A protein has these predicted regions:
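Interface amphipathic segments
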Residues: 1-345
């Protein structure tokens, strides 16, 4: 079977009067490669699904989902990897005749953070609530339908939160407030984030404040990033967003020298990936010109530097204490997961 965004091949056989077995694999443009296995009763089979990389933006990988028919519906077990570390989940899909279908999440564990709750599918949409706790994170995610629209509201707070991703992530304090409103096939987003003391591996950011307002994928986002305590780094930026393009302008200071984008940085959707046309970043008397492409398939980054002060690296890695300046080029390509080629001059 083939379609513009889906290819699938499989085979199966009937194993009894009302039982069968089926195996197949394919690729979907958004969710990547997948394997599917069905076996058991024709009307209530066991289902096993493996997704290689269903949501790259969240770092989801090797996602396994298994459904088993039980009294009252299906039990489910899921697991995989993510940017925040490994996750696992189990619960029930309740299909009681005469009642709304419901997903009961008994356990959704990401690193040490747990979410539990029940979400029902009503005539108007999804209704329910997931309660989040543990690992330094507390709050909830609310699902509320009505008047032809679906609201998803997240209120989450973090204090000394840690996630076992690769590399590990830690957050001293953070508050996320987000409303996602789905209306007639379009999505509206109003989100605010305030965070301090964020680290990912050796990268450290002192403070982040951001706000985004999008209507059906278009709108604006503003954010401010500052260095750790004692740092003089601060950068303010604004992004004009459409579904196929992000246009970012911004400027700031570090150690008394101006840091700015000479022209807006653009991210453009092209096919199944994104491109960054040549953009120049000026810092003090130096500059760096970069262009890139990333997404499925081949990815690349081209960077050319002229008299760029090395102290700029101290923004994210404050203990390095580098001095001097750098001239040269860096070309990085990635043609397959886990393989990279780097050229320097």
């Amino acid at each position: 079977m083939s379609a513009p965004k889906l290819s699938f091949r499989g085979s199966g056989s009937q194993t009894g009067a009302a039982t069968f077995a089926f195996r197949g694999s394919g690729r979907q443009d958004t969710y990547g490669r997948f394997d599917l296995k069905l076996d058991g009763a024709l009307n209530r089979p066991r289902v096993a699904l493996l997704l290689d990389s269903p949501l790259p933006a969240a770092g989801l990988s090797a996602v396994s989902v298994q459904l088993d028919p039980v009294k009252g519906g299906f039990s489910y077990v899921a697991s995989g990897g993510s940017t925040l570390g490994p996750f696992s989940s189990d619960g029930m899909i309740l299909t009681t005749p005469g009642q709304d279908t419901a997903v009961r999440v008994d356990r959704l564990l990401v690193s040490d953070t747990l979410a539990t709750g029940t979400i029902r599918t009503t005539a108007d949409g999804l209704a329910g609530r997931l309660v989040v706790s543990g690992g330094g994170v507390n709050g909830d995610v609310l699902f509320r339908p009505g008047s032809g629209q679906q609201l998803i509201r997240a209120n989450l707070k973090a204090e000394n939160a840690r996630f076992g991703g690769d590399p590990p992530i830690s957050i001293r304090t953070a508050v996320l407030e987000a409303d996602i409103l789905l209306i007639d096939g379009q999505s509206n987003i109003d989100a605010t984030l305030r965070a301090q003391g964020i680290s990912r591996g050796e990268l450290i950011i002192g403070r982040v404040a951001a706000n985004a307002k999008l209507t059906d994928g278009s709108g604006t986002a503003t954010f401010t990033v500052a260095g750790t305590r004692g740092s003089t780094f601060e950068f303010q930026a604004k992004a004009d967003i459409t579904p196929d393009r992000y246009r970012i302008s911004g400027n700031g200071q570090f150690e008394g020298r101006n840091l700015r984008l000479a022209q807006p940085l653009e991210l453009r959707r092209e096919g199944d990936g994104w491109t960054v046309p040549a953009t120049t970043i000026n810092y003090g008397s130096g500059s760096a010109k970069l262009s890139a492409r990333f997404g499925s398939g081949n990815s690349r980054l081209d960077l050319t530097m002229a008299r760029m002060p090395l102290s700029l690296v101290d923004i994210g890695y404050p203990d390095l204490g580098l001095g001097g300046s750098v001239n040269g080029t860096v070309k990085l390509t990635q043609s397959a997961p886990g393989y990279r080629s780097v050229k320097r001059s």
